[in-house]
Amino acid sequence: MTIFDNYEVWFVIGSQHLYGPETLRQVTQHAEHVVNALNTEAKLPCKLVLKPLGTTPDEITAICRDANYDDRCAGLVVWLHTFSPAKMWINGLTMLNKPLLQFHTQFNAALPWDSIDMDFMNLNQTAHGGREFGFIGARMRQQHAVVTGHWQDKQAHERIGSWMRQAVSKQDTRHLKVCRFGDNMREVAVTDGDKVAAQIKFGFSINTWAVGDLVQVVNSISDGDVNALVDEYESCYTMTPATQIHGEKRQNVLEAARIELGMKRFLEQGGFHAFTTTFEDLHGLKQLPGLAVQRLMQQGYGFAGEGDWKTAALLRIMKVMSTGLQGGTSFMEDYTYHFEKGNDLVLGSHMLEVCPSIAAEEKPILDVQHLGIGGKDDPARLIFNTQTGPAIVASLIDLGDRYRLLVNCIDTVKTPHSLPKLPVANALWKAQPDLPTASEAWILAGGAHHTVFSHALNLNDMRQFAEMHDIEITVIDNDTRLPAFKDALRWNEVYYGFRR
């Protein structure tokens, strides 16, 4: 069972009574066939539910109104099988607050050259019915996605499935609660921001809880539960000698397990699916949560360090979007560089908190080592390298008048040397198009030092996310050239300035 099982997408057919009852009967038959086939063969993440034909303004308005109030409905897929005059859609689309995709398809793939007549033409009018629908969307300035292709085409299936992931993610985001244990790292700018504006724009709420409230729950965890979780650690990870039974750091592992159980209980009781910590607010905790955070991220929670609620929320959103896809998604930070002509590299990591979903090793190492920051006992953590291949790093920043999403396409590579003295998980990558261009563009656009790293999602996924939430996106990839990138930033200032 995944989050997608909690939602469905409504399949709505637009038509009109001009063509007579026989045509509408055939439209209904075609729709039933297409929906059944898509649910059976297209490997869509959500179930499609066919709704009654929309042939009048009142029918269409009722469908849109019902979609708004049905918590299971993640969005609408609309197919204009025949011509459907778009003025009939105005009232419904005006009130619709769920994502909308126009599937520009038709029942037949090939034209029946020898038998085609006007009855066939009247029945299969997607080619211009879809354009009428597109006009009213443009006229109303209503954002919606469009997928063109035959309903049996695998590429069309993939694009609809990708959009469904976005639609479900948007509904989940509207209910997302972000818990901040403590406040921001002191004096840091990019991790701060307008929480009210974020809730208005995205729907997620951000509130702070004292670390003492968490400590109270952590201290209530029984020794039996702690021992059971440590047994799980023993089976899932390669334990260093210091962390094994009778090892000198065994007690630190037990404390890490207690923190994990306490954090999870606190988050579950509060209905939180994203959270932050900061090493400056640890009063009452025996160690900075490292292992606990790593494992909670792997279970789907959003997280970011130093109170960075925007990145924590973005990680949760991207975790939902990527559910069931190959590859992992994690909190990340650009940490340090390797400068070598033609082979510039970025080493990404954090103090402790990198999600094991991106690990190359089947069984990461569980170790306890010293951490000077935070002033607490040595924390437990998982240590691993990262899978290789194409990936992205994404950052969501608050510019005051709007939100900007930055995405850099990267290529993760194998670490060329062992890192015997680096006691944290890490990722090594080549930034596209090259490190000087990527880093300069990122800095000019105001990108944060915290990011969400993902092998599972790609640039197109993040473009869809930005469009669905109506926010700015800046892209750094192999096509990026700094002069054009700077121009785009200037144009965006003008565009979004006019929209205020």
Swiss-Prot record:
PANTHER family: L-ARABINOSE ISOMERASE. GO terms for biological process: L-arabinose catabolic process to xylulose 5-phosphate. Binds 1 Mn(2+) ion per subunit. Keywords: Arabinose catabolism, Carbohydrate metabolism, Isomerase, Manganese, Metal-binding. GO terms for molecular function: L-arabinose isomerase activity; manganese ion binding. It comes from Escherichia coli O17:K52:H18 (strain UMN026 / ExPEC). Belongs to the arabinose isomerase family. GO terms for cellular component: cytosol. The lineage of its organism: Bacteria, Pseudomonadati, Pseudomonadota, Gammaproteobacteria, Enterobacterales. Mn(2+) binds at residues 306, 333, 350, 450. It catalyses: beta-L-arabinopyranose = L-ribulose. The gene is araA. SUPFAM superfamilies: FucI/AraA C-terminal domain-like (SSF50443), FucI/AraA N-terminal and middle domains (SSF53743). Pfam families: AraA_central, AraA_N, Arabinose_Iso_C. It is an enzyme of class 5 (isomerase). Pathway: Carbohydrate degradation; L-arabinose degradation via L-ribulose; D-xylulose 5-phosphate from L-arabinose (bacterial route): step 1/3. This is L-arabinose isomerase. InterPro entries: Ara_Isoase_C, AraA_central, AraA_N, AraA_N_sf, Fuc/Ara_isomerase_C, Fucose_isomerase_N/cen_sf, Lara_isomerase.
